[in-house]
């Protein structure tokens, strides 16, 4: 089996899982690129990225440029390593053409959509939000564009009706190593394929997008909630307060149930009418509170006054 010298670039959990799996292969990880350490939490403690934690555990050189313009010496450090290939997944820093030109086989990006669909920052969320039944993993030869490079390998992944962005993220984290290792094994003979079809773009998520529109269908709302779980969380406004939603189910609606109205509130759930069904929320999170089952909320809060209230 072919043994390649690899520089790895990534930052969050999904990248860390791929890196862990790559360490279990025959390939040699020469260095790891990841974003600079950040101060996080109330105590503003410095935290390493998940990728840096994995690299340190495996005694690998870690490079953390703020950017390649501000830290151009990092490019020279990578050149000196003479990597066969650079593997990139969710690195989060723009790389210049001279970075792409360093390795013998170029730079491979692991992108979690079936390109050219959902190019950009939030392919997992946008695929669920759109109601797609399938998505996938593309191993792409990086070029100067935004996810525009030729495709070297793909793996289709089904989107279940219960999938959230978190569950789909976790699937991708486990599955990404398979098409990557296949690509590395066949890198001398694989024929890059130009992307086919009309591109769509997965624009960055904003917190405000979590707001639920109950005039839509229950299916659309289900996709919306699952797309924005766990972040930024789907929510509705109740008398000026933001209420985040948790677990839910879809029920049949009566002809006299008004769209956007709160139909009923019992220990079983908080029922809101959409344009075709009822969504029963089994969990809600009121401001400055934890996410709780409706039965637990009712133990300390009177919600009956909201029956008949129209959302939005």
Swiss-Prot record:
Catalytic reaction list: L-methionyl-tRNA(fMet) + (6R)-10-formyltetrahydrofolate = N-formyl-L-methionyl-tRNA(fMet) + (6S)-5,6,7,8-tetrahydrofolate + H(+)
EC primary class: transferase
InterPro entries linked: Fmt (IPR005794), Formyl_trans_C (IPR005793), Formyl_trans_C_sf (IPR037022), Formyl_transf_N (IPR002376), Formyl_transf_N_sf (IPR036477), Formyl_transferase-like_C_sf (IPR011034), GART_AS (IPR001555), Met-tRNA-FMT_C (IPR044135)
Claim: Glycoprotein is one of the keywords in the record: no
SUPFAM superfamilies with a match to the protein in the record: FMT C-terminal domain-like, Formyltransferase
Single GO molecular function: methionyl-tRNA formyltransferase activity
Binding site for (6S)-5,6,7,8-tetrahydrofolate: 113-116
Record keywords, A-Z: Protein biosynthesis, Transferase
PANTHER family: METHIONYL-TRNA FORMYLTRANSFERASE, METHIONYL-TRNA FORMYLTRANSFERASE, MITOCHONDRIAL
Functional description taken from the UniProt entry: Attaches a formyl group to the free amino group of methionyl-tRNA(fMet). The formyl group appears to play a dual role in the initiator identity of N-formylmethionyl-tRNA by promoting its recognition by IF2 and preventing the misappropriation of this tRNA by the elongation apparatus.
Homology family: Belongs to the Fmt family.
Designated name of the protein: Methionyl-tRNA formyltransferase
Gene expressing this chain: fmt
